[in-house]
């Protein structure tokens, strides 16, 4: 039997409204609350190597920039991912994250 998974894209899609400037505290709060609500997949933003790292934004230049977001979070149940718009993030910017 197939199961339905729920994906939340607030931190990526919502960024079109505020240039992905949610603030680190809000980013942490959104991720934590989504995980507590049982959301299966949390899209934490965009990967775009043309953008400089800014902890207050959910648009990141590489996967290593994701780590600081989780320094105060303990996410156990949700799959965490980011979207890449074709041509904006080279494969060398991607590393496996846990």
Regions found by a protein language model. Name each.
Residues 19-29, 91:
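Glycine-rich anion/phosphate-binding loops
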Residues 1-19, 75-79:
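N-terminal small/glycine-rich loop or linker at the start of catalytic domains
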Residues 15-22, 54-57:
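A short N-terminal beta->alpha junction/helix N-cap motif
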Residues 35, 41, 46-98:
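Active-site beta->alpha loop and helix N-cap motifs at the rims of alpha/beta catalytic domains
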């Amino acid at each position: 039997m197939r199961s339905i998974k729920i994906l939340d894209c607030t931190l990526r899609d919502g960024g079109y409204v505020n240039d992905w400037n949610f603030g680190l505290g809000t980013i942490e709060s959104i991720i934590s609350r989504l995980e507590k609500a049982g959301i299966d997949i949390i899209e934490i933003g965009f990967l775009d190597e043309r953008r400089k790292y800014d902890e207050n934004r959910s648009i990141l230049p590489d996967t290593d920039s994701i780590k600081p977001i989780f320094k105060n979070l303990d996410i156990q149940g949700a799959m965490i991912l980011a979207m890449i718009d074709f041509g904006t993030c080279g494969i060398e910017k991607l590393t496996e994250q846990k």
